[in-house]
Amino acid sequence: MAQPLYVSNLVVPAANIVGSTAKVKCASGCDAVVFATMKGTIYAYMASQKPTTINDTLLWATYLSDRNACQCGATGPQNGSGNFDMWAVDDPWWGVLSTPVIDRTANSLCAVTWTNDQQYRLYNLSLTTGRIQKGPVVVQGSVGGQTFAPNTSGFIQRQKQRAGLLLSNGLLYVAFGGDNPDALAGWLFVYDAATLAMKTVWSPTPNGRNGGIWMAGDAPAADAAGNIYVQTGDGDLAPASHSFGDSIVKLRFQNGALTVAGFFAPCDQMLLRQCDLDQGSSGPVLFRSVCGWRREGWKALLHAHRHDGGISTWSVSAAGRRLPARRARLHRWPQPDPEMAGFDGPHPWRANRLARS
């Protein structure tokens, strides 16, 4: 599910504020929390005031899905069953699954929602009023032998826009994974964040199979130079054919396209694929190196900065610390300490300190 987003000192014109308490206290600026829901609605609430009723602190609410919202429990897009997909996902609603992204410079928020007419739509909203500024833009594209086609029966709901959105250097990155044997390819769409004009699209397996970008809901990572990092799930690994399943991939946007600048694939990649263990079961984490986590509990630390030209295989600087996957899952990296790794999951939150090298 989408994670809540915190916004400090958000100024909302009093005339646009819904809640009575918020109307008094937020016109000159207040802390806020933004929620995106599976019903396709995005809410902004005042965070610094305990409400008498939940609507007291409501700043604004914007319904993205309109009449096309998926009421899976009522009708269901999968063979008329009431299940969302082949895995019998029976969420009563299916709308905004991924975490949106906020651009404080432009005072805007971008989000993606699924609609029951077999389409994903991208929106740009005003952070102060919630009004739709750009969009909806239908997500679609093709690369190599793969096509992301809206309005194709049974196709789009097999694509999951689970990974959070990334904003880097004015570009918006939207990643997908697939959960059907016929539609498992991963996708990474790139848009101009201000206009929502599509710039390019990349697939980890353009002429192969699988390689979804799931990352447990994490967004792709970006470094100061604008390089983008993703982790891919089970899939074909054939770098000569531009296939990067079960890999940590470093991408660079240049000349209007995403190119692979480097990658790491574990030596047991074939085993990972056969056992559905997914190198890409978490998002990559940047500090001095790149940290990736796989489903059964191994991590790899990579020297990403050593590879600035061409496609190159990263070296593993440290691997072998094993944590049971059922007890810990890497999702985020607390700041400002660049050497602390946080793990969360069904057991108590824990942290490991990494030694300098």
Label every PLM stretch briefly.
Residues 1-290, 294-314, 319-321, 348-357:
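Mobile, glycine-rich extracellular loop/lid and propeptide segments
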